[in-house]
Swiss-Prot record:
The gene is rpl30. This is Large ribosomal subunit protein uL30. GO terms for biological process: maturation of LSU-rRNA from tricistronic rRNA transcript (SSU-rRNA, 5.8S rRNA, LSU-rRNA); translation. Coiled coil: none annotated. Part of the 50S ribosomal subunit. GO terms for cellular component: cytosolic large ribosomal subunit. It comes from Thermoplasma volcanium (strain ATCC 51530 / DSM 4299 / JCM 9571 / NBRC 15438 / GSS1). Belongs to the universal ribosomal protein uL30 family. HAMAP family: Ribosomal_uL30_A. It comes from the Archaea. Gene3D superfamilies: 1.10.15.30, Ribosomal protein L30, ferredoxin-like fold domain. One of its GO terms (molecular function) is structural constituent of ribosome. Keywords: Ribonucleoprotein, Ribosomal protein.
Length: 165
């Protein structure tokens, strides 16, 4: 399973690249989508590689992401009880394992918002106009995407930047 994060905005972008980002549901900076790895997805990612970063997400990071940032329609949090009713999985860990192993697609879960909103990363991005291979942020980063996602999930802070009580 691939985690894809948009790191650059819309200004000065070619229309076909913007359309591809729209098809991937990456319309805003710091939005994340979870995609299955196939030839079509890889081709689309190569087209928008200067505006996004992606890599393989692991079970631990996906579990934290589902607990803290995944929402149902209407901006409701995903609780353990609703998780069991909607997906049939008893815990976040079981759902994360099934998603990573490809047993279920994230888009097949009913009433879940397909885009996950994140905070900007703690300590910031590296150079966003430079590829990850050359010391920047854009493009394919493999397993290192997990470190970036963990820096973007700030514990105790909701989606509006306010401390949760």
């Amino acid at each position: 399973m691939l985690a894809v994060i948009r790191i650059r905005g819309r200004t000065g972008i070619k229309q076909d690249i913007e359309d591809t980002a729209h098809l991937l549901r990456l319309n805003r900076i710091n939005h994340l989508v979870l995609l299955q790895e196939d030839a079509v997805t890889k081709g689309m990612l190569q087209k928008v590689k200067d505006y996004v970063t992606w890599g393989e997400i692991d079970v631990d990071t996906l579990e934290v992401l589902l607990k803290n940032r995944c929402l149902f329609k209407g901006r409701r949090k995903l609780t353990e009880e609703e998780l069991k009713d909607v997906t049939g999985f008893g815990s976040y860990r079981d759902l994360a394992k099934a998603l990573v192993d490809g047993k279920i697609k994230f888009s097949e879960i009913n009433d879940v918002v397909p885009v996950i909103r994140l905070n900007p990363p703690y300590k910031g991005y590296e150079a966003i106009k430079t590829s990850y291979r050359n010391g920047g942020s854009a493009g394919y980063r493999g397993k290192d995407i997990n470190n970036l996602i963990r820096r973007m999930i700030i514990p105790g802070v909701d989606l509006n930047g306010q401390r949760e009580n």
